Swiss-Prot record:
SUPFAM superfamilies: Restriction endonuclease-like. Belongs to the UPF0102 family. It comes from Cupriavidus necator (strain ATCC 17699 / DSM 428 / KCTC 22496 / NCIMB 10442 / H16 / Stanier 337). This is UPF0102 protein H16_A3579. It holds the Pfam family UPF0102. NCBIfam families: PRK12497.1-3 (NF009150), YraN family protein (TIGR00252). GO terms for molecular function: nucleic acid binding.
Length: 131
């Protein structure tokens, strides 16, 4: 039998996710990146943050938060399936642009007392998007 989250549990989960994105956004801004879009969604995918690096590179950022390092921690939770969904959303987003800039895919992994920014965390080949 499937388990369903109560409205309160869902709201708490969404709040924690928004707070994690806020922390990631603040960190990336301190590193010189500028926000372009937050929570870009399309059918089949979503991107937590789209940022622009000082060199003009468009950076698609997946933000993951975990309460501990069990099961490999926050970074390990970005599975190939999740990577494919981010890549799909990125392709959709890029199709809206007149000119496609250089791009990369980063992960910001948050755990208690720790924030890791993993640049070039994955690409189309690693996610198996071409298969």
């Amino acid at each position: 039998m499937p388990s369903f989250k109560s409205t309160t549990q869902l709201q708490n989960t969404q709040l924690r996710g928004a707070q994690a994105e806020d922390r990631a956004l603040a960190h990336l801004r301190r590193q010189g990146l500028e926000p372009v879009v937050r929570n870009y969604r399309c059918k089949g995918g979503e991107i937590d943050l789209v940022m622009r690096a000082p060199d003009g590179t468009l950076v698609f950022v997946e933000v993951r938060q975990r309460s501990g390092r069990g099961f490999g921690g926050a970074a390990a939770s970005v599975t190939p399936a999740k990577q494919r969904r981010v890549l799909l959303a990125a392709a959709h987003y890029l199709a809206t642009l007149a000119q496609v800039p250089p791009c990369r895919f980063d992960v910001v992994a948050l755990e208690p007392g720790r924030l890791d920014w993993l640049q070039h965390a994955f690409d189309q080949d690693a996610a198996g998007a071409g298969s």
